Amino acid sequence: MKKIILMLLLFSIFFILKSESQNTLVLNALIYDNTPSRNPDFEASGSVGVQKNLVKSVLGSDGTPVYCCGNSPSATIHNQTTFQSWFHNVPGVNLPIQKDIILTQSLSNPNIYSYSNDSYFVIDGQGFDDKSVYPNERVYRDAFGNPHNFHFCLQAHTEFQYKTGDVFNFAGDDDVWVFINNILVVDLGGIHTIASASVNLDLLGLTPGQNYPFDFFYCERHTVESHIRIETSLAFKCPRYDECGVCEGDGTSCCTPNNCDNNPIYRTNCITAKCSNNVCVTSAPYCSSTEPCTVGLCTPGVGCSVVPKNCVNENHCTQDSCNSTINACQHDPIPDCINCAYIGCITTDYCNEQVCSADGRSCETRPKNCDDLNFCTVDTCSNGVCIYTRIDNCVNCTGPGIGCITTDQCNPNVCSPDGNSCIIQPKNCSDGNACNDPSCVSGGMCMLTPVNCDDGDDCTFDSCSSTVGCIHTNISNCVECQNIACITTDFCNVKICINNGTTCDTVPKTCDDGDSCTIDSCVSPSGACLYEPIANCVNCGGNQCITTDFCLPLICGPDGVTCAVEPKKCDDFNPCTFDSCISPQGDCGNAPIPGCVACNEILGCTTTDPCHPITCSAIGDQCVSTDKDCEDGNHCTINSCQNNNGTATCLNSLITHCTDCPGIGCTTTDFCFQQVCSATDGDVCTTVPLNCDDGLQCTVDSCIGPMGVCSHIAIAPKCLECALEPCITTDNCQPVICGPDGRCIQETIEDFCDDYNYCTVDTCTGVGCEHASISGCRNCTNGIGCTTPSDDACNLQVCSETGDSCLTMVLNCDDNNDCTEDKCLNTGICQNNPIDGCVTPSPVSIGGTIPPTTTGVSQVECDCCPIGQKCLLVNGHEICIKPATTGGIPELTTGCAGTTTGRATGHYTESGTGNPHLCDRYHCKRGMECHVVNGVPECLPSNYKCLDCLDLHCERQGDFTCFMVKNPNFISSKHSCYGESCCKFTPVCKPKGHSL
């Protein structure tokens, strides 16, 4: 979304300067650089527009806005914790940066000051945008692909003297809040497009001529542009103006068109410069382009030019171009392309795939493998699909690459026994039957033709044997008639010739004995008569009465001619038997009825379910049903009866997780609450909760049902078990420890991250200590550091002799030549320009002088220079100066040798020898002392005493040398170590030539 940064007064420390002629206002402020990876409020998704009431209407007690909603989210703000880093220093989350902004007086209305910048990226390359310090932070870019720092918050605080008619106008986007007299007068919160506001101070009830506080807060939280536009008539205070009318100016801002607007150095280096009220206002080097798909290019020494936008990416499988409609690069994927190291390989024939070469610089064709290892198929590829066409009449052989194809089905091609060749094997159509004549016809079909065995003799039987062929057997009882044979095979049916011997006729044999209860027949083929009695047959007047079911036998009726039925009786007069006649044999069946009890000769009681037996009543006149008793006396069983094929089986199933009590069964369904027998009443169950207490205060103990699993969850990652309560540390810079009374206390660590170097800025980030060096700073002896500005190296800030204050020492550039004009440049370089027409006077012998030093430090009295000698403090070291006995340069000598204790700071060297000056200018706080450890001065606790190689004198032990090794007992905290445990290294003697 488009960003228009709205700023008036920037950041925490805010000095606004104003001149008599009202040319400019200089705004000094503090900016807090944030990043989306550390605070999700920045680059938040969505655009919700202007959202009011995100902060309370009255400024907080610390001079910053108060978030509306505590720990609850609102639109693009997550909670109070994330909002805290907007306007407060939170190490590890944000970075503070000082910046200025200059408002210019209006030419048409001297009471109005304004500032406008449509590319206001105030901290590009700084803070989290500095890749030399934060290489892993993401780079955010504008619509043209240029990297910028889009995520920061600023605050500004000042006073103004109210006058009637005062106004304050601005336009911009994202969060802006303005407080006048601690009351909110502008409320433009949220991520939004450009929004404007105007404040008429006459409506605020202010008193003319009276001073009021003015507090301004702004956050830029989203890509992709940044603008600022300000107009105000407020009379902000300024203590001093220079001759150019610049508030707190240095007198160098006056300019002319020649050295500003038309300066070729600016133009050829892509810098826009313009004189405004004698101030040369310059921009950062920047080249723009208004044509789509082009960008501005700055060539130092030449100027701006327009070049096509480079849309080529590292993917060789995209079609890279610039879309002039949206003025943006687009990368269209190339179908069927493989991205190689230096080229893209495109496959157009899917049967011949394009792949990367081994070095990635060219493409290689890889034909698709369609071999199915079947020698009876034709393998081809079409559009990347393998096609396998079957070869008709083909047989795969076992040999390599062998397939045998048959073209004549009567003479097929088959595999040889070894499978390595094809042989012709004529088709065998014989079925092994001598009665068939085999042959093979077209298409490989077998034909079997029957053999003709007819011998033309009617009284021979012509047949064929599958093994011997045709057989001609004489036919017995054959009468040869005219062209026909009449053969008697059954003498119950004799064959004779009729019709003049042209046909045969059959004459049946008669066999009747006149008895209706016999079956008369002729026995073939012998022709003998047979008279068989009919079983169970009664001859009733020539009629047959045959009994087939002896339960229903047939007898002659009263007339002696017809048949009558006489049923068989089988009653045994027992009510518990089933009486029946068994057909057809007529046997009586009196089967006992299972489970039947005879109550009398008529009534029987039958049990069909053995679990519910049927018995006779007491007087035997009726049947009574009862239940089988399966009770086992156990309260933790389910008792039942089961009918197993007529047998009653008692089932006593145990109830799981049940305890058998005297009068009840107690069943547990949730093992977090076990059911047990009551100790006082055997008919009652008691619930006993599972004890999951692990005895630790830093865990939350619970039972997970129904399985009864104990859970012990830590209440915090860093928790200490103290006597009376758990102690939780949430901030590594403020650890919580156990107090003497067993309760939690905040551990007081004085100067936790203080490295005792007054030329560093020490902070605790929650992860570790950070020590940022202060450029141009020197440590003094008594607790201060003196910093020389980088733009004023001619005025060195040096330590006073006592080390408790800073002195300004002007760099001496006098070259003792009367014919040069001597001056010092701001960079600290002396410049000695010859004076035209000047004649150098003859040399005159004079007393010795003290040569200038690179530090410009004057002479002071030193601790141990010989009497009559002076010294210079050069980079914190004493250099003694011996006066010259004759004219010329004094002689520089070394400082004092031996040891020193410094000035009331307890400084001393390790072994009492060596260079004492390493600690002489190294200041340590109370309770700390300076020690030279391995040739480096360090502030360590007063109880520290470490040895080094000078203490051991390994050379006195013979052919030995000394090594410094890591101390295994070293304690890194300078507040917790004592004696040897404060030493990082300890010396050991080893034979020469030995290596660690």
Curated annotation (Swiss-Prot):
The keyword Nucleotide-binding does not apply. SMART domains: PA14. Residues 1-21 form the signal peptide. Glycans are attached at residues 79, 117, 323, 396, 428, 474, 500, 645, 779. It is found in: Secreted. Keywords: Glycoprotein, Secreted, Signal. GO terms for cellular component: extracellular region. The keyword ATP-binding does not apply. Belongs to the prespore-cell-inducing factor family. This is Protein psiR. It comes from Dictyostelium discoideum (Social amoeba). The gene is psiR.
